[in-house]
Amino acid sequence: MHIGIAGNIGCGKTTLTKMLAKHYGWTPKFESVAHNPYLEDYYKDIERWTYNLETYFLAQRFQDVLDIAKSDDVIIQDRTILEGVHIFVANNKAMGNMSDRDYETYMHLFRLMMSMVKKPDMLIYLKSSVPHLVSQIQKRGRDYEKSISIEYLNNLNERYDKWIEEY
């Protein structure tokens, strides 16, 4: 079984994933941000690095979904492959940070990948106010997250609300 935890930056996905994995004996699958070679550059120059960052995340998340499909364990994952396209890529496209060409290339890759894998069996959505997100982001103290704007977090929250409503 594949359980996805979805939600904005700083909403508590990793914390909930750890708690549920420990309590139920599930296998946690965490989004790898520590080894992402684009993340720091992305927050310094979003328009320049959006395609690279999102394509890197797409490849990582696709690998995660392939690994999850091979497992007999109950896997709980913080951040799903679906959030990349429906939240982050859609937001960057709307903000003018991704060209039409890059967007179409990304979407082609996403559709190909999704034709080979399935959605999570269950999705848990964590909703949080922007002031709470800002507080949590500041608490964890990742240097590259210091430049995240309130507008960006608001946009993501709106996209999450719309996506979850249609899910």
Regions found by a protein language model. Give the residues of each.
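A glycine- and Lys/Arg-enriched "phosphate-lid" helix/loop adjacent to the NTP-binding pocket
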Residues: 86-159
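Pre-Walker A (Motif I) flank of P-loop NTPase domains
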Residues: 1-2, 72
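Short amphipathic alpha-helices and their capping/turn segments at secondary-structure boundaries
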Residues: 58-75, 111-115
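P-loop (Walker A) phosphate-binding loop of NTP-binding proteins
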Residues: 8
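Conserved lysine of the Walker
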Residues: 13
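Hydrophobic anchor at the beta1->P-loop junction of P-loop NTPases
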Residues: 5
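Conserved substrate/cofactor phosphate-moiety recognition/catalytic segment
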Residues: 22-60
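Post-Walker A alpha-helix
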Residues: 16-17
